[in-house]
């Protein structure tokens, strides 16, 4: 039997750039796969997380989010900025994104390896910096999003993601919801359908009248 959320999926998209070379991007990809597997295996999330790769340029950002908009199964995107300043690749084309957005402003590690930390580690693990810049640019673009507080392995953080997923699923389901209004005015007339038209543009639901107000 299909469960309520089986028809949906949430994409996981990692932001990076080629400033530190291909080896860094390979490491970013490995960390991203580790996080996605951990989130799916946690048992806390109602919707499956699907890793959609690392985006390293504005063209890749645009292509990925355009694909998300056109995929009926995708109800939202989890963004994670792994390296230094991936948000520079987010431009005006990102403003057309229709999917729900959440971001994980935390490094893949839960602690800091003080004994072994070097510049390679510092250059690679800059989520705190990258996600702050991402938050800055999407705020300037007036894009609403959920910011998850806490490490991705923490139960509290996973519960935040789960709640966001449920809201995103409800919104997606409402886009083709049929609402029947009783005792309404004339149907399919621009003037009398004004309120119904407003509701449709606001929540995406189809307002339909079956029983007229005249008795």
Each predicted region: which residue ranges?
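Metallocofactor- and cofactor-centric catalytic cores in central/energy metabolism, strongly enriched
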Residues: 1-215
């Amino acid at each position: 039997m299909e469960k309520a959320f089986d028809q949906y999926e949430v994409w996981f998209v990692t932001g990076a750039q080629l400033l530190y070379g291909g080896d860094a991007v390979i490491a970013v990809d490995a960390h991203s796969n580790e996080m996605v597997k951990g989130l799916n295996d946690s048992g806390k999330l109602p919707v499956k997380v699907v890793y959609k790769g690392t985006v390293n340029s504005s063209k890749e950002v645009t292509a990925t989010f355009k694909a998300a908009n056109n995929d009926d199964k995708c109800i939202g995107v989890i963004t994670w900025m792994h390296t230094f300043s991936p948000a520079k690749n987010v431009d005006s084309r990102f403003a057309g994104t229709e999917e729900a957005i959440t971001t994980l402003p935390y490094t893949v590690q839960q602690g800091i390896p003080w004994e072994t930390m070097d510049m390679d580690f510092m250059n690679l693990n800059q989520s705190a910096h990258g996600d702050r810049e991402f938050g800055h640019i999407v705020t300037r673009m007036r894009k609403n999003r959920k910011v998850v507080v806490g490490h991705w392995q923490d139960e509290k953080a996973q519960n935040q993601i789960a709640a966001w997923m449920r809201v995103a699923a409800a919104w997606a389901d409402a886009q083709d919801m049929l609402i029947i209004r009783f005792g309404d005015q004339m149907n399919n007339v621009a003037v009398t359908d004004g309120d119904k038209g407003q509701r449709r543009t606001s929540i995406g639901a189809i307002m339909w009248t079956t029983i007229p107000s005249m008795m």
